């Protein structure tokens, strides 16, 4: 039996992490605007989340005094171009029973690529799930255009996604 449940956006979260020159990292959060999870038994078989890119925050203490500057730069056309692409989405296409892996399509800056959420922990009673999605920002055009500065920023962005269903 398939059961589609809305995501509780106030208790769900997406934490991001990016690395610079392999030495230090920045991390923070973006809010989930809306979404749903489709459950079949103990597995998630479908669903989607819409991430509100306009809610980006920094939570690490490195350069915390410059948080507004960092977030503004990440929201700029150099990176996520939030003015033109205020949301990102992840649409679940399937999951592999017993592997804690969920597959889907991630859309950032209007570009959609297949991605994998790994190490997913499912809680069948509360209908919640937490997992890690790592993506190559270059595939989505998240880069300084033609700049050597781009080499200072690691290509991999990690998102820890924690979703709670509304029961």
Label every PLM stretch briefly:
Residues 1-167:
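Low-complexity, acidic/polar, glycine-enriched regions of mature
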């Amino acid at each position: 039996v398939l059961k589609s449940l809305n995501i509780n956006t106030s208790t769900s979260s997406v934490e991001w992490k990016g690395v610079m020159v392999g030495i230090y990292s920045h991390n923070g959060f973006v809010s989930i605007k809306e979404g749903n999870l489709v459950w079949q038994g103990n597995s998630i078989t479908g669903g989607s989340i819409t991430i509100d890119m306009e809610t980006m925050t920094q939570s690490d203490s490195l350069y915390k005094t410059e948080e507004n500057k960092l977030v503004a730069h990440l929201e700029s056309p150099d990176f996520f171009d939030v003015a033109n692409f205020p949301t990102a989405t992840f649409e679940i296409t399937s999951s592999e029973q017993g592997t804690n892996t969920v597959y889907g399509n991630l859309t950032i800056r209007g570009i959609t690529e297949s991605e994998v959420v790994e190490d997913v922990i499912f809680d069948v009673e509360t209908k919640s799930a937490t997992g890690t999605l790592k993506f190559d920002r270059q595939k989505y055009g998240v880069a300084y255009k033609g700049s050597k500065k781009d080499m200072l920023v690691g290509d991999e962005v990690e998102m820890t996604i924690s979703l709670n269903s509304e029961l």
